[in-house]
């Protein structure tokens, strides 16, 4: 099960007027491009009107700090006040391999730490907690305006991004990155607190975690154990945090609003017509060519 919906990089709708030589009137809905939003643009009025749920600023801040970025591209969550982290097994599988000792087969037999001393440090793993967001669109676009050519504008943009990232990283002590939204329509500065001491707590056997294979990967409900548990340490002790998701024994009920928070790798919902035409005419055919050759060879 892949977490695909998120508040970090979630999108809200834009209306596109496509000029193809004649006037074309189309009705558009605010959610034509999906119900995906960033935290800073969550439609709280819509939540309350449609679901009767009041998403206060305190609630948004709490869930933002409870969700974390796991390694280079997965989602995870704090699920206890002692730094316990839950993520998907396929996100942690490679890290499990890195702490497997001689004579062990953790992929086949799984792993469980009965106490804190049994938890295994993963030297190549970190988690990031989003703590600060700043809209820096005006700063970057203003810097680009000084350029007279596309090359100059691109160079000025890169220089300004580096300047902003360096400034806020130095001032806050956080890891700050400028994130591009809407193909350059908006630039946000995301500042993360990074935790480098992360230890393996539990990982099921690969056969149990991946039961059903890829065909079941896009079904719901899915009957497998695609989860893994780690723990974040701070100064050699389990991290103490007031921001975490409480475990629910009952699960969701019918009609209950459900929010999924995480870190998607990318989205293609806002591609332009030119980009889609290029994909249709070049990218997709180039991808299909070797696949068709292989299919004909095997068949």
Label the model's feature ranges:
Residues 1-27:
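Bacterial Sec-dependent N-terminal signal peptides
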Residues 21-299:
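Terminal presequence/propeptide segments associated with secretion/organelle targeting
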């Amino acid at each position: 099960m892949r977490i695909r919906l998120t508040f970090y990089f979630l999108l809200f709708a834009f209306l596109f007027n496509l000029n193809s030589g004649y006037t074309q009137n189309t009705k558009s809905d605010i959610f034509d491009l999906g119900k995906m939003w960033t935290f800073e643009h969550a439609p709280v009025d819509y939540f309350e009107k449609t679901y009767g749920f009041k998403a206060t600023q305190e609630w948004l801040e709490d869930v933002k700090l409870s969700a974390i970025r796991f390694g280079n591209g997965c989602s995870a969550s704090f699920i206890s006040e002692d730094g316990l982290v839950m993520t998907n097994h396929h996100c942690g599988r490679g890290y499990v391999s890195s702490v497997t000792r001689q004579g062990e087969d953790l992929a086949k037999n799984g792993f469980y730490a009965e106490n804190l001393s049994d938890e295994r440090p993963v030297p190549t793993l970190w988690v990031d907690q989003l703590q600060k967001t700043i809209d820096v669109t005006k700063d970057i676009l203003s810097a680009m305006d000084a350029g007279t050519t596309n090359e100059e504008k691109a160079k000025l943009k890169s220089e300004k991004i580096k300047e902003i990232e360096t400034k806020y990283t130095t001032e806050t002590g956080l890891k700050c990155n400028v994130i591009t939204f809407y193909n350059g329509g908006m630039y946000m500065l995301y500042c993360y607190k990074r935790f480098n001491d992360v230890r393996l707590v539990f990982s099921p056997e690969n056969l149990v975690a991946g039961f059903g294979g890829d065909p079941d990967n896009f079904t719901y409900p899915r009957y497998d154990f695609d989860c893994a548990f780690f723990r974040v340490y701070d100064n050699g002790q389990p991290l103490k945090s007031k921001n975490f998701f409480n475990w629910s024994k009952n699960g969701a009920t019918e009609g209950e609003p459900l929010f999924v928070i995480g870190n998607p790798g990318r989205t293609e919902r806002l591609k332009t017509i030119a980009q889609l035409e290029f994909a249709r005419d070049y990218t997709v055919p180039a991808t299909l060519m070797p696949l068709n050759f292989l299919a004909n060879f095997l068949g």
